[in-house]
A protein has these predicted regions:
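An N-terminally biased module of ancient metal coordination in phosphate/nucleic-acid-related enzymes
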Residues: 1-82
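Extended substrate/RNA-proximal surfaces in nucleic-acid metabolism proteins
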Residues: 57-147
Length: 147
């Protein structure tokens, strides 16, 4: 018997939430992406739409962005649970560190309700402040994963 955590792959970085970023534009594109991943042996997916860390400085803008993602994610979840009942679908964000000191206290920014957080930087350039920023995250109990 294969232990559950070794049974199939887990995708921790996907843009399958329809219409919220540069990934799937429609639910049909998301469905096609799910099929490809399932055929590749993926059993668990954490969806990670783009989220700008600077939004954490404005509660209204942050809630507006998360509500947009929530609506589209629920549509994806309903389709997935109906058509692919054996697939585990989880939520997260790919947090763009466009500011050096974001407030990452909101659990919705983390991967699948864990202490892991997927991060990236603007322009695919790692700024000089990266090591101190990541050290602060780790000291706060977070486990950053670099996209």
């Amino acid at each position: 018997m294969i232990p559950r955590d070794l049974d199939g792959y887990t995708d921790l970085h996907s843009h399958l939430v329809p219409g919220v970023d540069d990934g799937s534009r429609t639910l049909e594109e998301s469905r096609a992406g799910l099929i490809k991943l399932l055929r590749s042996g993926v059993k668990r997916i954490v969806t990670t739409p783009h989220f700008d860390a600077s939004l954490t400085r404005d509660a209204a803008l942050m809630e507006e962005r998360l509500a947009q993602i929530d609506r589209a994610w629920e549509e994806l979840r309903l389709m997935s649970s109906s058509e692919f009942p054996d697939l585990e679908l989880h939520r997260g964000q790919e947090v763009m560190l466009d500011i050096p000191d974001p407030d990452l206290s909101d659990r919705r920014l983390f991967l699948a309700d864990t202490h892991y957080i997927l991060v990236e930087w603007p322009g695919l350039r790692v700024p000089p402040s990266t090591l101190p920023v990541l050290a602060r995250f780790v000291e706060a109990g977070m486990r950053p994963i670099i996209a």
